[in-house]
Amino acid sequence: MFSKKKKKPLISMPSNFEHRVHTGFDKRENKYVGLPLQWASIVGNNQILKSSNRPLPLVDPSEITPTEILDLKTIVRPHHNNNKADTTSLNSSSTMMMGSMAPMNPMAPGAHPMMSHGPGMMMPPETGGIVLPKTSHVARSNSLRSSSPPRVRRVANVPPSVPEEEGPPAAGTPGVGGASSGGFKPPGAHPSLLYNSQHAHANGATGPLAVRTDQTNLQQYRSNLAPPSGGSMPQQQQTSPVGSVASGTRSNHSHTNNGNSGGSYPPMYPTSHQQQQQQQQQAKQGGDQNQNPLHPHAHPHPHHHQHLAKSASRASSSSGGASSAAQQASGASGGAAGQPKQDQRLTHEQFRAALQMVVSAGDPRENLDHFNKIGEGSTGTVCIATDKSTGRQVAVKKMDLRKQQRRELLFNEVVIMRDYHHPNIVETYSSFLVNDELWVVMEYLEGGALTDIVTHSRMDEEQIATVCKQCLKALAYLHSQGVIHRDIKSDSILLAADGRVKLSDFGFCAQVSQELPKRKSLVGTPYWMSPEVISRLPYGPEVDIWSLGIMVIEMVDGEPPFFNEPPLQAMRRIRDMQPPNLKNAHKVSPRLQSFLDRMLVRDPAQRATAAELLAHPFLRQAGPPSLLVPLMRNARHHP
């Protein structure tokens, strides 16, 4: 009748805790002090972010898109399980959930957008609200950066890049949520990003209890990927896709969880100890998986130098190899998180060696002079210079390897624009490593970004059609090669002096193929994101079409829909509401409205492709590029 009161479990204090970095805020100067070098250009002190009134792209580094559909096996354990068995099963599960940044074919590298910690992921539509991790700022140069919530109207704090997770083989499979990237998560943890304070963690046991808890959570979360009809995905043989871990440090912000239901767990970052274990596992596994992806049970190879050199040599011959080298360099750096400083320096040299295999040899300063800085972003600076041999002006993008949140994304800057040539894509001439900086030499487009035009001018339909036609030609080419841009907006469209339109900023692009037909990362700039990206549903090249439709609204109304609202609220509206309408709908022709309606379709399967849109009657109004020259002149006269 009277049961004995159970004794409360004893919970120890964190062990081996180290307070390595302390960051404060100077109220007098209104800036952060004591920021780590990685964050110095991201939070608080970035003059570019202060002066810019444009929203910033984001990538959410909490998830990675696995390359194959894998169901977690049901594991039945007796109470006397030993640590070894549990640890083995956990490693297997962690391996299954790791994502691949490398493309599945040699056409081009998959761009894996994880650059920083930022505002965040969305909860699946069934669970109610969108939950953003820490606010993220990404400059126009395609880098995610995090900072405080938006204070300026046009500065968007957007969710960080969500590592890619696996998409169902069928395009219509409405899987929601993402697989864990291998990190330990306590009960209730969710891979989505949140405003989340980093908690101290015990140096921790990997015994049966910890493993069983994590395994159970993985199984519970994996169940969210099943179609809503209740049918389970067919079981497939377990494989181990190549993984890459987000190495960027995440900023510490407290958060409030709102509206989690339906079995979804509130997102949570792995603790520092969890990250170290996760990174060490992936660093060990990454080498053999890159070499032999068809044999998932290959044993990890201890010699990272040899694997790095091999993968780097492959990188010089194909873009897929470049991404592979980037992964291994990233994995090595992740594994060195808890190691001495000497190992960290070695990791930097490994990454630099891998990048050196992709870029051109030599020093560009021997052929370039008269450097003049014209811009700065969160990933680096942009200068114009003169080529001594030809006398032409070129643009030089300089990116410091040590200041990148996701330095493997630098491979996209080199490989994508190098391997894909099209009249409407910015031409890259060469790339170099100068000390610890990556220099990308590309054509200089005097006309600037389309943003200057849509902000200061009003475009007529003939000019809008001219821009759209050239953009669609570039997108049709990229999509035919399996490349998704994922950050289409006016900031990514550059104009030459004669009015030619060119697509730029490929730092967030991704590769799809028959083996990996869909992506699920939360990547892009909030106001231009498609509903399926925000909802974390599998998506393909059709997301670029939605973003282009939003850019058309930009050209008509001067800004994208919901631009006066915070990014989180705008994303929620895009996810839950009908496609946005033009403010000045009464001023546009039925042809333009029909053209827009073909792009802003909530169902990706019903959305027009780039090739289909090129045949739309509205584009018959397109004229020569010279139609845009007066708009560029008008934009130059505005500050």
UniProtKB/Swiss-Prot annotation:
Residues 91-129, 138-159, 227-241, 274-295, 309-331 have a biased composition (Low complexity). SUPFAM superfamilies: Protein kinase-like (PK-like) (SSF56112). The modification Phosphothreonine is found at T525. Residues 11-24 form the CRIB domain. Expressed in adult brain and eye. High levels detected in developing photoreceptor cells and future bristle cells, and lower levels in cone and pigment cells, as detected in third instar eye imaginal disks (at protein level). SMART domains: PBD (SM00285). Its EC number is 2.7.11.1. Disruption phenotype: In the adult brain of mutants, the calyx, peduncle and the lobe system of the mushroom bodies are reduced, along with other neuropil structures in the central brain. The Kenyon cell body layer above and behind the calyces is thinner. Additionally these mutants have a rough eye phenotype and bristle malformations. It is found in: Cell junction, Adherens junction; Cell membrane. Residues 368-619 form the Protein kinase domain. Changing T525A: Strongly reduces autophosphorylation and substrate phosphorylation. InterPro entries: CRIB_dom (IPR000095), CRIB_dom_sf (IPR036936), Kinase-like_dom_sf (IPR011009), PAK3-like (IPR051931), PAK_BD (IPR033923), Prot_kinase_dom (IPR000719), Protein_kinase_ATP_BS (IPR017441). Residues 25-367 are annotated as: Linker. ATP binds at I374, G375, E376, G377, S378, T379, G380, T381, V382, K397. One of its GO terms (molecular function) is protein kinase activity. This is Serine/threonine-protein kinase PAK mbt. It comes from Drosophila melanogaster.
